Amino acid sequence: MRISTPFAAAALGLLALAGASHAQDAAAPVRGYSLPLVDLAADTARQVIVDREPGQYLGHPTTVLLEDGRTIVAVYPKGHGRGPIVMKRSTDGGRTWSERLPTPPNWETSLEVPTIYRVADAKGTKRLIMFSGLYPVRLAVSEDDGASWSGLAPIGNFGGIVAMASLVPLRTGAGHYMALFHDDGRFIAERAAEGPRRFTVYKTISTDGGLSWGPPEVVVSHPVAHLCEPGAVRSPDGKQIAVLLRENSRKLNAFVIFSNDEGRTWTAPRELPGALTGDRHVAKYAPDGRIFVTFRDMALESATKGDWVAWVGTYDDIVNGREGQYRVRLMDNHNPWDCAYPGLELLPDGTFVTTTYGYWEPGAEPYNVSVRLTMAELDRLAAAARRF
């Protein structure tokens, strides 16, 4: 996203670290934010091209880090969500990437963004699983860390959008998982619902290590907000699950809900501060206990609206409606919105590797890039700047 106003030009330098998290009234969140902003968009030394094909839209990657701490598997579509699924592998923590790897023939039929996860069953057998959404949601399985895969097969008589946006290991038993997705009435059943679309977030449960999944259950809907793309993160003590939600009517901020009983029940949705407003939130804990959240910036008042950004703060900031510590612009998107469904991995040395698509060059089709960073690097950059 190209920013040219005087306000934006001032905002997009290395702006401010004020030290403590910035408080807001959670009952009336502002549409913008007052956080410091660290701008990494021009720091090409951090950027690694994962895949690029002239004239071809390459979109929406998700990634998974294997137990060796250096192998990352990425999957993404040739197209905007819909399109043949491409798979690549890095064996050096995202510094270099393989050529495109062989995939089963019916991966060519994918209708939605693929999402990949590590799972294990009650016996300790580890697998990789990959979902592909719309109707019906389908699943592929690898028993050998992604060297070979099954074809896509339906998991049930239901569909959904960005399935599965989050996968949460549950404390209810070994091999138990909760997967979260959304639908607007078009794909949850074989026949689309008639009447106005209503965005609803659903869960589905697996008790056999991700091989089979139960029927969808409603998690949350809202009379005004269009809630979707659930991004889950646990509290530091593991007892609570928070889910950050995109707000697709573009009238309100992003939302959050909480569960204290492993997803059986949920709090009423409430708005987040503008600093966390955006799409397709993906969150991981840094080694020091802070949270790094990467997403597409769609705050209603933001100099980086439409860009690939990140937020740094604490779980308590999310719970208490505080702005957090600072924001980061990861890359400049030359499109009003189309970018940043990111993968996010934390390497053993504390390096975050976050990967996504976007219009990174004017006039070019989107392609996939990884950005590497550490919290210590971000803290130094933020501390050297002034508050915005």
Language-model features, listed with the residues they occupy:
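Positively charged n-region of N-terminal signal peptides that target proteins for export
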Residues: 1-5
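Asp-box/BNR beta-propeller blade signature and adjacent active/binding-site loops
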Residues: 24-388
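Bacterial N-terminal signal peptides
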Residues: 8-18
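Sec/Tat signal peptide C-region and signal peptidase I cleavage site
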Residues: 20-22
